[in-house]
Amino acid sequence: MHITSRTLLFVLAGALSACAGSPPPVESAPPPPPPAPTQAPPAAAPAAQPEAATPPKADPEAEKKQAELAKLAEDMKAMEAKADKEAARFDDALKAEVKALIAANYPSAGAALRAALKGKHRTPGNADRDAARHPVENLEFFGLKQTSTVIELGAGEGWYTELLAPVLAKKGKLIITAFDPNGPADSRNTLYGKRVKRMIEKSPELFGKVDVVVIDRDSPKLGIEGKADLVIAIREAHGWHRNGKFDAYVAEAFKALKPGGVFGIVAHRAKPDANPDESAKQGYLPEAWVIQKVESAGFKLGGKSEINANPKDTKDYPEGVWTLPPNFRLGDKDRAHYAAIGESDRMTLKFVKPAR
């Protein structure tokens, strides 16, 4: 068979076409890898909390002051309540008794004092201390007369004032010192001043002729010269020294007295070798020291009495002299023991202002 070139080309083209067929399948692309697991973002650190403010440190002095003010307010309230009750006690019958006590005639100051000791005008409870305080013996030793002009330095709660007032009302004169009742509200001295004021006001019949001289504790001035026959300071001297005013008070007493006048001191007696700066904090002073100080102001020692001595007083208590009766500062702790000791051992000194 004759194969032409055209035929050959045709055959070759068919063969090529058959060989080509359908194109080979295209391999599918591998699936994409799974996404990487999402990591949770790290937890944010908690916001810093502001530091709590540190409370200010307690100021011991401020706390002490607050406690003192609270106690002062409590004591002021108690004082006013007691004064109200005492004023109410002075009814018409008691006022009449006071007038009769003052009007009566007595042969001596001692007799007048003994009559006053029995009076119902005395603050309830005060008579309980007569045996320990010896008021008649003290005042007779100091030379009290019914005609005397007497200055009482520091009336306190009026223990001596209510005895002296009726004795001197008719022929003599009683002058007492007190702190300002209108002083600063945060001062305990103001309480003391108010207490004296309330005492004087409760009975014009008893205290109407008593003069009150208001003094400044830090600068005591009586404003009296050469008029007094007797100046007394009963259980006051330790406080004078503790406040650095011992010399000032003694100088005022000297100035106020007539020549020949008497300065009478009753004070808690320390051990002979005691340091007065330290013993005064406990309420006591050495007797020799007191004598030396008073004589250095111009006085002469006119006599000593042991009427107020108490050998049971050991003078070494936790709360000083205030551990003993009548204060009993420890309350019920060892109360029977301190009651058995009794009131303090006291010096009783009579000084005389020399005549010109």
Say what each PLM segment does.
Residues 210, 221-231:
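A short acidic, Gly/Pro-enriched loop at the edge of an enzyme's catalytic core
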Residues 145-156:
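Conserved class I S-adenosyl-L-methionine
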Residues 165-166, 246-259:
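A short glycine-rich, Lys/Arg-flanked "PGG" loop and its adjoining helix->strand segment in the class I
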Residues 174-178, 260-269:
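Conserved beta-strand signature within the Rossmann-like core of class I S-adenosyl-L-methionine
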Residues 15-18:
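C-terminal motif of bacterial Sec signal peptides marking the signal peptidase cleavage site
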Residues 217, 239-252:
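A short, conserved alpha-helix within the catalytic core of class I
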Residues 20-23:
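Bacterial signal peptide processing site
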Residues 108-141, 145:
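Class I SAM-dependent methyltransferase Rossmann-like catalytic core
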